From Swiss-Prot:
GO terms for molecular function: calcium ion binding; serine-type endopeptidase activity. It comes from Pan paniscus. One of its GO terms (cellular component) is extracellular space. This is Coagulation factor VII. Heterodimer of a light chain and a heavy chain linked by a disulfide bond. PROSITE patterns: ASX_HYDROXYL, EGF_1, EGF_2, EGF_3, EGF_CA, GLA_1, GLA_2, TRYPSIN_DOM.
């Protein structure tokens, strides 16, 4: 008769030889040697109840004493290797068991103290998480947040101008007519009509908002308050941009064929050319200054600065556009996707000019894309570092003849800045072509120096550049 111990051993070890031996030993008992599963007087397989009695974990020495005591972490898992179930018996809580098991099974990932600058560490399965103090960030709390406050990183958080300083945190500054608030980043106007603000919109009842009309639509009266109209002998010539009470920026090519300079005027506050509403201010142009490097009939260095005979009076309909600092323009404004261009140019290529001031929202292109496009057209002038492209290549929208000299205005954190001057293009809204604008940032120092200078004799002046 096969002992119960032998049958259990055979079942656990799965040894056919063992079972076979049992079969041989009991052959006389009537079981078939090759079919031990068949029932007989001495069966090999045990009952379910007997099997459950076998599948208990092996007891340690003195197990009968251990079972009388509650689970001990020191005894169960530190003196000897324990299982997840044994750990659960100790902690009596699944979540606490999981937290323990992460560290117990793959080691404590926080043991090397990876979190820097006072950060606290939480162990994870083959990983860890650092909880940083408020002034730090990063995977290991290695980055001091103030080190990220540099001007190339989102303008250092400044509303207007940003300056980096070696060894110290960046500082914010404001344009003339604004002052820095106590937060060190925001700017508030200190004059009634600061540059780059639109009084009509600032004063409008917030309960009745009227968004700016863009996409080649009419600019509502007063919403392009820096727009200037240049005229000679009573005829429309070009557009311009008021940058302070006595100076207007425009395009140099507008003056290539001027003969009677005495009849050149600039009109501010204009909206509808077919009517006079009392908000217009006309001023004779006393002097036109162009770069010495500009060659008439060409496209490079296409910028002009006009000195008015008398300053204009700032009103809700006459406000200058801010002339930004060069670093701010190149580092921040140049990466604003959309800007506004405005003027009374032709509504269609070779079509009639607009009577009401028009405005268009145009996307700025990367210089490389602009260069590639210009190379596809044999007779297209070269795109230089003094220009940039903006607009739509599908021929749907563009600035046009008559818009020349007008502003490319960029909005940033509540203030508008002059970033470009309408210069030239292949036709108007021609498929495959973009509008080309004078890159104002290249001329900031040149413009500022001229505006600080004393008047010089002569109407047309060629000033050294750079």
């Amino acid at each position: 008769m096969v002992s119960q111990a032998l049958r259990l051993l055979c079942l656990l070890l799965g040894l056919q030889g063992c079972l076979a031996a049992g079969g041989v030993a009991e052959a006389s008992g009537g079981e078939t040697r090759d079919m031990p599963w068949k029932p007989g007087p001495h069966r090999v397989f045990i009952t379910q109840e007997e099997a459950h009695g076998v599948l208990h974990r092996r007891r340690r020495a003195n197990a009968f004493l251990e079972e009388l005591r509650p689970g001990s972490l020191e005894r169960e898992c530190k003196e000897e290797q324990c299982s997840f179930e044994e750990a659960r018996e100790i902690f009596k809580d699944l979540e606490r068991t999981k937290l323990f098991w992460i560290s117990y099974s793959d080691g404590d990932q926080c043991a090397s103290s990876p979190c820097q600058n006072g950060g606290s560490c939480k162990d994870q399965l083959q990983s860890y998480i650092c909880f940083c103090l408020p002034a730090f960030e990063g995977r290991n709390c290695e980055t001091y947040k103030d080190d990220q406050l540099i001007c190339v990183n989102e303008n250092g958080g400044c509303e207007q101008y940003c300056s980096d300083h070696t060894g110290t945190k960046r500082s914010c500054r404001c344009h003339e007519g604004y002052s820095l608030l106590a937060d060190g980043v925001s700017c508030t106007p200190t004059v009634e009509y600061p540059c780059g603000k639109i009084p009509i919109l600032e004063n409008r009842n917030a309960s009745k908002p009227q968004g700016r009309i863009v996409g080649g639509k009419v600019c509502p009266k007063g919403e392009c308050p820096w727009q200037x109209l240049l005229x000679v002998n009573g005829a429309q010539l070009c557009g311009g941009t008021l940058i302070n009470t006595i100076w207007v920026a425009s395009a140099a090519h507008c003056f290539d064929k001027i003969k009677n300079w005495r009849n050149l005027i600039a009109v501010l506050g204009e909206h509808d050319l077919s009517e006079h509403d009392g908000d217009e201010q006309s001023r004779r142009v006393a002097q036109v200054i162009i770069p010495s490097t500009y060659i008439p009939g060409t496209t490079n260095h296409d910028i002009a600065l006009l000195r008015l005979h008398q300053p204009v009076v700032l009103t809700d309909h006459v406000v200058p556009l801010c002339l930004p600092e060069r670093a701010f323009s190149e580092r921040t404004l140049a990466f604003v996707r959309f800007s506004l261009v405005s003027g009374w140019g032709q509504l269609l290529d070779r079509g009639a000019t607009a009577l009401e001031l028009m405005v268009l929202n145009v996307p700025r292109l990367m210089t490389q894309d602009c260069l590639q496009q210009s190379r596809k057209v044999g007779d297209s002038p070269n795109i230089t570092e003094y220009m940039f492209c903006a607009g739509y290549s599908d021929g749907s929208k563009d600035s046009c003849k008559g818009d020349s000299g007008g502003p490319h205005a960029t909005h940033y954190r509540g203030t508008w800045y002059l970033t470009g001057i309408v210069s030239w293009g292949q036709g108007c809204a021609s498929v495959g072509h973009f509008g080309v604008y004078t890159r104002v940032s290249q001329y900031i120092e040149w413009l500022q120096k001229l505006m600080r200078s004393e008047p010089r004799p002569g109407v047309l002046l060629r000033a050294p550049f750079p």
